[in-house]
UniProtKB/Swiss-Prot annotation:
The chain crosses the membrane at residues 3-23, 49-69, 464-484. InterPro entries: ST7 (IPR007311). Residues 192-219 form a coiled coil. This is Protein ST7 homolog. One of its GO terms (cellular component) is membrane. CDD domains: ST7. It comes from Caenorhabditis briggsae.
Length: 536
């Protein structure tokens, strides 16, 4: 940064020297120095000269002061961290360290055939990336396969089916497995996910898969059931995992078709199985379903259970578990004050706020610190796309996974989005300062999970070097023009007319040159092929 400022000052001096060199004729600098002595020169100066000199120097000083303030505002914390960070690294753990780029499965993932494929047919755009689908294939292999499947033809075929890249090949392979064993639950799950046109059809296939896996589990003896927790029967564990997965997807089908009580009951039953429900993140599905029926007391109890919301222990000293947890807890606090909240949007210092309003603002700020990509989607500043099947915590993918299903809950509460907008306007300048809270690896990893046609959200939004240089040159040009307009108004006006005339001539010459080799219908030709942007 110091090198760039040195370069700018040297550039300033060089521009002034070049300007004086080219204006030595109109300004008659050499004649003035030869014919007029210093004493007579200063005696002949009018008060207008001193007024112009004072104004110009004040302008230059103000510009320098603004640049210095901008520099120290953006780099003071970095320099202080470099000096003092080494003394505290070993003794104090920073609670806001950059998280690892660990990929998490989206518990609210849509059905590929019934939902993702409909979007692809309507927009002719791929909603999922191959990397995202490959991660799903790995998840299915780990959930639905085990080492004891060797020698069982249908399960060996399903191992091949999950690895197939194309959907048609996976479907054909699953049908081959069903031809061998009509009660193969994993094959039915694959067909429900990728070979059904509607959610209702997917639900029917999943119910058939549930009956098949329950028949398989009923064949286990009581001794095997008693020894499962201790000895870890891998085959039974695999079958229980398949059963839990199918029940969760059936509850999601009920939620999508408006049977909310049935969906909540299914999610509650699954949440009692701690190990499997935690593995599949059933609590996120349960929280969203309770929000849909406006059971806010149940949502608060779930947050206390899964994220420590409302407790006075170490909640304020640690990071939230996910964007869904942090923004849901903020929504509950905003709900109590949003309708009667009155705050000027341009004021960053709020006075006379109640404790509930301050708590709501702090909760929103905390949620934005965890994932600042969410508010632009909730406020509909950025275009929404289909959520991916996997996401990265604190990334744009997690923001899409949350906002896609929860934006309706924010709209339902009067004043919630208005309060979110007010806090967001004050938060954007702050998050752009913190260049160390978000890793560049997170942004590049998100690109693998999101489609290429999606404009990815990035924080902090730093200014480009080209923009900074353009702003600097504009300030320098304004200062030079101000000096010339005060010192030599007649010569300055003539020179300005020459510059404008030269610019117009250059524009006309360039347009004539372009029209000589470009076809006459190039504008209609370009306008006839607009870029198609996928719409939801």
């Amino acid at each position: 940064m110091a090198c760039s400022w040195t370069f700018l000052w040297l550039l300033w001096i060089a521009m002034v020297a070049v300007l004086l060199f080219f204006l030595r004729g109109p300004l008659k600098i050499s004649e003035s120095l030869e014919s007029v002595s210093a004493t007579s020169y200063f005696n002949n100066l009018t008060p207008k000269f001193y007024v112009a000199l004072t104004g110009t120097s004040s302008l230059v000083s103000g510009i320098i002061l603004i640049f210095e303030w901008w520099y120290f505002k953006n780099n003071a914390g970095v320099e202080q961290g470099e000096d003092e960070g080494s003394d505290n690294e070993e003794s104090i753990d920073n609670p806001k360290t950059v998280p690892e780029c660990k990929v998490w499965r989206n518990p609210m993932a849509l059905f590929r055939a019934a939902e993702y494929n409909r979007f692809r047919k309507e927009t002719n755009s791929e909603p999922l990336t191959y990397y995202d689908m490959n991660l799903s294939a790995q998840d299915h292999q780990s959930l639905f396969m085990c080492d004891e499947d060797q020698g069982r033809a249908e399960y060996e075929i399903m191992q091949v089916a999950w690895r197939e890249r194309e959907s048609e090949q996976r479907i054909q392979t699953a049908r081959t497995a069903l031809a061998i064993n009509s009660e193969c639950a994993s094959a039915l799950v694959l067909l429900a996910e990728e070979d059904t046109e509607t959610v209702a059809q997917a639900e029917n296939v999943l119910r058939r898969a549930l009956r098949a896996i329950e028949n398989t589990l009923s064949t286990y003896s009581n001794n095997q059931i008693a020894s499962y927790g201790q000895n870890g029967d891998t085959v039974r564990k695999r079958d229980l995992t398949i059963q839990t997965y199918i029940k969760r997807r059936l509850a999601m089908c009920a939620r999508k078709q408006g049977r909310l009580r049935e969906a909540i009951k299914g999610f509650r039953d699954l949440s009692r199985e701690q190990s499997l429900s935690t593995l599949l993140s059933v609590q996120d599905n349960l929280i969203e379903a309770c929000l849909e029926v406006q059971a806010y007391a149940d949502v608060q109890n779930l947050l206390v259970r899964y994220d420590g919301y409302g407790t006075s222990c170490s909640y304020d000293q640690r990071e939230p578990r996910s964007a869904a947890m942090s923004y849901t807890s903020a929504l509950l606090k905003v709900r109590a004050v949003a309708e009667n909240f009155r705050c000027p949007s341009e004021s960053s210092v709020r006075r006379g706020l109640s404790s509930a309003e301050q708590t709501a603002i702090e909760a929103l700020t905390r949620a934005m610190e965890f994932n600042p990509h969410v508010p632009p989607y909730l406020l509909e500043i950025r275009a929404m796309i289909m959520p991916p099947e996997h996401f990265l915590k604190r990334g744009d993918s997690e923001a899409l996974a949350y906002a896609f299903f929860h934006i309706q809950h924010w709209k339902r509460i009067d004043g919630a989005l208005q309060l979110l907008s007010i806090v967001w306007k004050d938060f954007v300048p702050k998050v752009n300062k913190d260049t160390h809270a978000f890793s560049s690896q997170l942004e590049s990893a998100d690109k693998e999970l999101l489609p290429a046609w999606h404009e990815q959200s990035a924080f902090p939004q730093t200014e480009s070097t080209l923009g900074m240089l353009i702003q600097t040159f504009a300030c320098l040009a304004i200062c030079i023009l101000a000096v010339l307009s005060q010192q030599v108004p007649s010569s300055y006006g003539e020179m300005l007319r020459q510059i404008v005339t030269s610019g117009v001539q250059m524009y006309e010459n360039s347009m004539n040159t372009f029209s000589q080799w470009a076809p006459n219908n190039i504008i209609p030709y370009l306008a006839s092929k607009p870029v198609s942007v996928p719409e939801i």
